[in-house]
Regions:
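Conserved adenosyl
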Residues: 108
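Long, basic/Gly/Ser/Thr-rich N-terminal segments
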Residues: 1-42
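Nucleotide-activated chemistry modules centered on ATP-dependent adenylation/adenylyltransferase
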Residues: 1-11, 16, 45, 49, ...
Length: 401
C-alpha cells in the first residue's frame, strides 16, 4: 500500500498482494469503491505520525504486507503497525510526537457521546460530518449529516467540525467507516493545533467489555478495537493521542440517563435520518426507544411492528449485540409483554434485580483511563453512578459463558 497526502486530500495505491475486499478490525468484510478521499479544514503541517495514523484508519482493511507513507514516520508508530497488523511501515526517521495536555471529545451527538462529554465539560468537541464524494454519486440523501452538525454547533461548546467524504471509499456493505477509528481521522490531523493528548469516544460497556455490535458476544478485556493495550490503542498512543473511553464502564441505560439529565439534552440525537427529531422508523431508533422507555419507566412508544426486518434481530434467540439492553428493557418497560418485544420474554428471565448491575460502573474501566484524566472520570462515576459490587463485577467478567 502506498499512501500520499496533498493537504487534506488522501490517495492510496494498492500493491499486488493487497485486496479489494478486506476485513476491518472487527472482521467485517469491506469492499473498496475508490482510492481517494478528502478531509476538510485540516492543517498541512501536522506531525507526520498523525498523517500516518489518519491514513491507516482508512487503508488498514485492504493492506496486507507493507505500507509506504509519503513522509517519514517515527519508529514508535512503525513498531505499533508491525506489532498490531504485521505490516512493514516506512520510511522511518521522524521524531515521535509528544502528547498534548488536552482531551478532545469525538462528538457525534448521540446519547453515549453526550454522556462522555458531560464528564468533561471543559473539553472541545471534534465532530465528523459526511459530505458527498466528488466522484461517487450520493444515493443516501436521507443521511442528514447537516442536521447533526447544526445540533453540535448549538451545544455552546467549542466545536470543530471536520468534513470528509472518506466513507465513500466503501462500496460494500454501504458507505461507512473503513475502520471505526476513521471517525477520528480529522481529529488526528488537528491534534497539534488543539494540543490533544487524548481523544474521548462514547463507546460504552457493551462495546468495550461485552463484545457488542459485530464482535464476539463475550467478555472482551482484550478488545482489539477499544482497549488501550489493543492494537488501535497502542497505535494512537504512539502518535501521542491516547484513546479514552469516559463511559466505557457503564451501560447504554446509564449513558441515556446521563445524557437526558445533562445540559446537552436538547441536542441529543442518535438518528441519522430525522430532521426535526429522530425518524422513529429505523432499527437504531427502536433500540434507543426501548432504552429510553426503560430509563423513564414509561410504556414503549414506537410505530415499528414485529414485521419489520430490522426488528427481527431483537426477537430471535440470543446471543446478539445489545442483548444486555434488551434484558434491561424487558425488566422495566411497563406493558412490554404487549409490544413487539413480547416474544423476547421467552428467551430471558429478566428482572430489575438480575439487571441492576447495568446501573453501575465497572471499576476496571476507570483503571484503564490515562492518568491525566482518570481522577475526573472516577469522581464523576462515584458521585453520579456508583461502582459495581464484586458480584456485579463478576456479571461482566462472566458475560457470554
Amino acid at each position: 500500500m502506498r499512501v500520499t497526502w496533498t493537504g487534506g486530500d488522501l490517495s492510496f495505491r494498492l500493491d499486488a498482494e493487497d485486496e479489494i475486499t478486506g476485513r476491518a478490525s472487527d472482521e467485517h468484510p469491506v469492499k473498496l469503491a475508490i482510492n481517494s478521499c478528502t478531509i476538510g479544514g485540516v492543517p498541512a503541517d501536522a506531525h507526520p505520525d498523525l498523517f500516518a495514523v489518519a491514513a491507516w484508519t482508512v487503508v488498514a482493511p485492504w493492506t496486507r504486507r507493507r505500507v509506504l507513507f509519503d513522509r517519514a514516520i517515527s519508529a514508535e508508530v512503525a513498531a505499533a503497525l508491525h506489532d498490531g497488523w504485521g505490516v512493514e511501515a516506512g520510511p522511518v526517521g521522524a521524531e515521535p510526537r509528544r502528547p498534548g495536555p488536552t482531551l478532545g471529545i469525538s462528538y457525534s451527538g448521540g446519547a453515549d457521546s453526550v454522556a462522555a462529554a458531560t464528564i468533561f465539560p471543559e473539553s472541545p468537541f471534534l465532530h465528523f460530518r459526511r459530505v458527498p464524494h466528488r466522484r461517487i454519486p450520493n444515493r443516501w440523501p436521507h443521511y442528514r449529516s447537516d442536521v447533526l452538525a447544526e445540533l453540535a454547533a448549538k451545544t455552546g461548546r467549542e466545536v470543530t467540525t471536520v468534513t470528509s467524504d472518506l466513507e465513500y471509499t466503501l462500496a460494500e456493505p454501504r458507505p461507512g467507516y473503513p475502520e471505526h477509528h476513521a471517525v477520528a481521522a480529522g481529529a488526528l490531523l488537528l491534534a497539534d493545533r488543539l494540543g490533544l493528548g487524548g481523544l474521548g469516544f462514547g463507546y460504552e460497556m457493551g462495546s468495550r467489555w461485552l463484545g457488542g455490535g459485530r464482535y464476539l458476544h463475550r467478555y472482551t478485556p482484550d478488545n482489539p478495537m477499544w482497549s488501550p493495550h489493543g492494537k488501535w490503542g497502542r497505535l494512537f498512543a504512539a502518535a501521542g493521542v491516547h484513546l479514552v473511553l469516559p463511559v466505557g464502564g457503564v451501560s447504554e441505560a446509564t449513558t441515556m440517563r446521563l445524557a437526558l439529565n445533562s445540559d446537552l439534552r436538547e441536542q441529543v440525537r442518535w438518528c441519522l435520518r430525522g430532521t426535526d427529531g429522530p425518524c422513529r422508523d429505523c432499527g437504531k431508533c427502536l433500540y434507543k426507544e426501548l432504552i429510553q422507555a426503560a430509563v423513564e419507566r414509561r410504556p414503549l412508544n414506537t410505530p415499528v411492528t414485529a414485521e419489520r426486518p430490522f426488528a427481527r434481530k431483537w426477537l430471535r434467540k440470543p446471543p446478539y449485540g445489545g442483548q444486555e439492553m434488551i434484558e434491561y428493557g424487558l425488566a422495566r418497560v411497563p406493558g412490554i409483554e404487549n409490544t413487539l418485544f413480547g416474544p423476547a420474554l421467552d428467551f430471558f428471565e429478566a428482572t430489575e434485580e438480575s439487571t441492576s448491575w447495568l446501573d453501575h460502573c465497572y471499576p476496571p474501566a476507570i483503571e484503564e483511563i490515562p492518568e491525566a484524566w482518570r481522577a475526573q472520570v472516577a469522581t464523576f462515576m462515584t458521585e453520579n453512578v456508583g461502582m459495581m459490587t464484586e458480584a456485579e463485577t463478576r456479571r461482566v467478567e462472566n458475560w457470554g459463558n
